[in-house]
Amino acid sequence: LPMTGAVIVSTPQKVALADARKGINMYQNEKVNVPILGLVENMAWFTPAELPQNKYYLFGKEGVKRLAEEMHVPLLGQIPIVQSICENGDNGTPEVLNDGSQTGQAFMAFARRVVEETGRRNAEQAPTKIVEVKK
């Protein structure tokens, strides 16, 4: 199947950023040549339920944002760590449906950015070729 583009997900830790960089380089390699729609930072910060305005950067601050700038790809979003993601997921309710929450809004903003970047990519670039893996 041809790929419209790749979304690279990383956490802000240095080792995760190194892996994300390798992924970007792989997709941008002329043999693969799949456009990068952008990066998303997972576990960007921790926000406790009782202090929803506080942000604790447990794994580093804005590492994916810096990588996006360095690699010249869009930053599609930053998703915090909050207990409700796990709880709602376990209950079968995606966090994105909780539009009153900061996290639900972050997921919606990320989804909108993916749609925007996909539309931009499709308007500006030819369809990708099917990536063939040869033995």
Each model region followed by its residue ranges:
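Conserved catalytic-core segment of NTP-binding enzymes
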Residues: 1-87
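Short, charged low-complexity intrinsically disordered segments located at boundaries
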Residues: 3, 97-98, 135
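Charged catalytic carboxylate motif
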Residues: 19, 102, 106
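Charged, solvent-exposed alpha-helical segments that act as regulatory interaction surfaces
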Residues: 33, 116-124
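C-terminal boundary of histidine-terminating zinc-finger modules
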Residues: 91-103
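Acyltransferase
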Residues: 105-119
